[in-house]
Design a protein with these regions (language model features):
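Glycine-/small-residue-enriched transmembrane alpha-helix faces in small-molecule transporters
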Residues: 1-39, 44, 76, 80, ...
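Hydrophobic/aromatic residues within transmembrane alpha-helices
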Residues: 29, 36, 40, 88, ...
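Membrane-interface interhelical linkers
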Residues: 1-17, 44-73, 86, 116-126, ...
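Specific alpha-helical transmembrane segments that line the substrate/conduction pathway
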Residues: 35-46, 86-119, 158, 239-258
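C-terminal-most transmembrane helix of multi-pass membrane proteins
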Residues: 1-3, 41, 52, 140-141, ...
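Helix-helix packing/entry segments at the starts of transmembrane helices
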Residues: 97-103, 168-190, 223-259
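Hydrophobic transmembrane alpha-helices of multi-pass small-molecule transport proteins
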Residues: 48, 72, 111, 120-141, ...
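Transmembrane alpha-helices of multi-pass small-molecule transport proteins
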Residues: 31-80, 107, 111, 130, ...
Length: 288
């Protein structure tokens, strides 16, 4: 096996572990979900924006109003994802929430087919049907592990929101670098969260240092050690391999939740969650 691929697989594992920790950190937070999301994006922008301004160079001069508008829309979708998913973790089990939010791939597939004329094979439709069936069962399961229909519904809505973010990003990344795209999108996401804080009357200031540290952990582990590492791994590994590896996130998160919070999924959650992950994995296989 080439050294590059071996290294990439090790880094990919770190990325999966980083994203798995995010659900645990959100569960530890005692602040409102919007505050946790705002702190995460605040730290992310603070850490990434200076480097983006320096590395973007002349590309910033080529950014159009349309680019800014689409990146702003992408940021709004990402903000909704964080707000919805973080809130779901307060109402349902970590296992259910992370499994349901992984259906992002399915929402992306459907959106790509409906909006961009993308084609889905018969096997792909079968995979989508399996994931939808599993999601439906899982949404009403989990009573033994603190799951609620509302919390599971929020996780699914969060998956749909991040799928919209992904679809816009797929279009924008054709002519914008990762540096410029993420800088614009994350900034728009932070602004959106601050607006939501204001509209809902959520106090951003006055929370103890613990909450700021949780936000910093989310920015470092999930954004810098998670999504950014996934992007780096695509230089050595196939998108299908990376997507399949990301499905380990709900498994790792569920194990950590079992150890730290005593959350043990009941049989219905195990079966339906397995159906969801199997459907997503099967669809990923059809896209290889």
């Amino acid at each position: 096996m080439p050294v590059g691929r071996s290294r990439a697989k090790g880094i990919l594992l770190l990325g999966v572990l980083g994203t798995a920790v995010s659900a645990i950190l959100v569960r530890y937070s005692q602040a409102p979900s919007l505050v946790t999301a705002t702190y995460r994006l605040g730290w992310t922008v603070l850490l990434l924006l200076p480097a983006a301004l320096l590395r973007g160079g002349a590309e910033w001069k080529r950014v159009t109003r349309r680019d800014v508008g689409l990146c702003a829309l992408s940021g709004v979708c990402l903000a909704l994802h964080f707000a919805l998913w973080f809130e779901s973790l307060k109402w349902t089990s970590v296992a259910s929430s992370t499994a349901l939010v992984s259906t992002e791939v399915i929402f992306v597939a459907l959106g790509f087919a409906l909006l961009f004329g993308g084609r889905i094979s018969r096997l792909g439709w079968g995979a989508i049907a399996l994931a939808v069936a599993g999601s439906t069962v899982l949404a009403f399961a989990g009573g033994g592990a603190g799951g609620t229909v509302g919390g599971n519904g929020l996780a699914l809505a969060g998956a749909a929101a991040v799928a919209a973010y992904t679809l816009i990003g797929r279009y924008q990344r054709e002519h914008l670098s990762t540096t410029v795209y993420t800088a614009l999108t994350y900034t728009a996401c932070l602004i959106t969260l601050l607006v939501l804080d204001g509209v809902t009357g959520t106090a951003v200031w006055g929370w103890p240092p613990r909450e700021w540290l949780i936000g910093l952990g989310l920015a470092v582990f999930c954004t810098l050690m998670g999504h950014s590492l996934f992007s780096w791994c695509l230089r050595e590994l196939s998108p299908a391999y990376v997507s399949a590896a990301k499905l380990c996130e709900p498994v790792f998160a569920a194990v950590l939740a079992g150890i730290l919070f005593g959350e043990i999924p009941d049989p219905a959650e195990w079966i339906s969650g397995g159906m969801v992950l199997a459907g997503v994995l099967l669809y990923t296989y059809t896209e290889r």
